[in-house]
Regions:
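Short, charged low-complexity linear segments at domain edges
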Residues: 45-65, 274, 314-327, 332
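Short loop/turn microsegments at loop-to-beta-strand junctions
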Residues: 69, 295-297
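Radical SAM enzyme [4Fe-4S]-AdoMet core and its adjacent flexible, acidic
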Residues: 3, 170, 175, 180-290, ...
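Conserved alpha-helical substructure of the radical SAM core
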Residues: 7-9, 15-22, 27-35, 43-155
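Core AdoMet radical
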Residues: 68, 87-96, 109-123, 135-149, ...
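Acidic (Asp/Glu)-rich catalytic clusters
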Residues: 107, 135, 156-160, 199, ...
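Flexible mid-to-C-terminal extensions adjoining Fe-S/redox cofactors in radical SAM and related proteins
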Residues: 312-395
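Local cysteine-cluster metal-coordination motifs and their immediate loop/turn environment
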Residues: 76-86, 294, 309-312, 339-350
């Protein structure tokens, strides 16, 4: 933690907030990857300009703007995952210059962490140029199936500034993973991508895993972590199935609070070993920490330019080709207070009621949903930091 405490201006942060952050960060161990000191991949390296921006703009400056964003670089993907948040999205893809401008605009709004997603983002031929356009004061993380990766492309991404990659791998057995992905060869593509990035030696390598309730409520999740440790990766990035598409709009698919806490405990126990970092999204976004920041601190721009709260929430407030991105984000923030639990888990039944066959749901349906949506009170961090809005219905 000394590396974090040495960050310029960290002493200007309120003591109660610093204590909160130290307790949270104390659940992880810093890992040196290349020249980067990394706590986990949902935060920039603590010795980076991006982390300094987090301290200066978000902690000291208390910026009201977003801190994190994800951009879909393409909707194309050879795999066919049943609960993929992007699979049913339609629309003409934006061009490279529009993506680069969106990155520039997001940084102006306060974004210091940017995730590239898809579809399969590696299928965007300009991905290296797009990565380089973010500069050295914004942390870039890539989410990929591994399809389309070459050693040359991996090296190009590293030179352009990529600091972390999450390769999708959901099961230790090849046949099971391939079946879930609807793509023969998915497992081998993922394993090749993991090895390719590890061979570079300077990119933080994670595996992103979507856990089913069956895996959570058996020994499968813990057994899988043991398998991942054997791959030599730096981090296991865990999430659960989200009710983002009609196939998952049912109670049987949605995690319970008890199951979330079970995964939090699993993460904490593994992190005490100090080997591979386990980073469970529901821990970061739990009410005891930072809560759900969809539409508040998190922004999602899909491959066709639709701007929404997060990758898991199929709603749009407008298209950046039709309205300025900053204007769309400001409106979205007014309607999306930061709450203490996952918005889509709490409100997916409203999507069932208002869905008209289009994904993402259009602006009209989005506003109708928000008239009925439930938002919880601010999570622990925002109660201390003073930026959480009161739990309420959006108007």
């Amino acid at each position: 933690m000394l590396a974090i405490l040495k960050t310029p201006r960290i002493a200007l942060v309120r003591p109660s907030v610093n204590l909160f952050l130290m307790r949270y960060m104390g659940k992880f161990r810093l890992k040196r990857v290349g020249g980067n000191l990394i706590l986990h991949s949902h935060l920039p390296p603590v010795n980076s300009k991006a982390f300094a921006r987090f301290v200066n703009e978000q902690l000291v400056g208390r910026s009201a703007g977003p801190s994190h964003a994800q951009i879909g670089l393409t909707s194309a993907c050879p795999q066919h995952c049943g609960c993929c948040y992007s699979r049913r999205r339609a629309g003409q893809p934006v061009d490279t210059e529009t993506i680069i401008k969106a990155i520039r605009d997001l940084k102006r709004l306060g974004v210091f962490w940017l995730g590239f997603t898809g579809g399969e983002p590696l299928l965007n031929r300009d991905i290296v140029r797009i990565t380089g356009s973010a500069g050295d004061d914004c942390a870039i993380k890539l989410f990929t199936t591994g399809c389309g990766l070459t050693r040359e492309l991996a090296a190009g991404l590293q030179r352009a500034g990529l600091y972390s990659v999450s390769v999708s791998l959901d099961h230790p057995e090849e046949a099971v993973h391939d079946q879930g992905r609807g793509y023969p060869g998915a497992y081998r593509a993922a394993r090749r991508a993991i090895d390719t990035f590890l061979d570079l030696g300077t990119v933080h390598v994670a595996v992103s895993t979507v856990l089913t309730r069956e895996m959570i409520n058996s020994s499968q999740a813990e057994d899988f972590l043991g398998f991942l440790e054997g791959l030599g990766i730096h981090e296991a990035w865990l999430s659960e199935v989200k009710p983002s598409v009609p196939a998952c709009w049912n109670r049987e698919a949605v995690i319970t609070e008890a199951e979330r806490l079970k995964l939090v405990d699993l993460q904490d126990r593994h992190n005490q070993k100090g080997k591979m970092t386990v980073n469970y999204l529901g821990h970061f976004e739990g009410r005891e920490h930072f809560g759900c920041n969809a539409g508040s601190k998190m922004v999602y721009v899909d491959a066709s330019g639709e701007v929404g709260p997060c990758v898991f929430t199929p709603m749009t407030f407008g298209n950046l080709r039709e309205r300025p991105l900053a204007e769309i984000v400001r409106e979205m923030r007014k309607r999306f207070p930061s709450g203490d639990s996952c918005f889509i888990n709490d409100n997916y039944e409203l999507l069932k009621r208002h869905h008209r066959g289009r994904m993402p749901l259009g602006r009209e349906e989005t506003l109708a949903i928000l008239k009925e949506a439930r938002f919880g009170p601010p999570a622990g961090f925002f109660q201390l930091h003073g930026k959480g809005d009161r739990g309420r219905r959006a108007r």
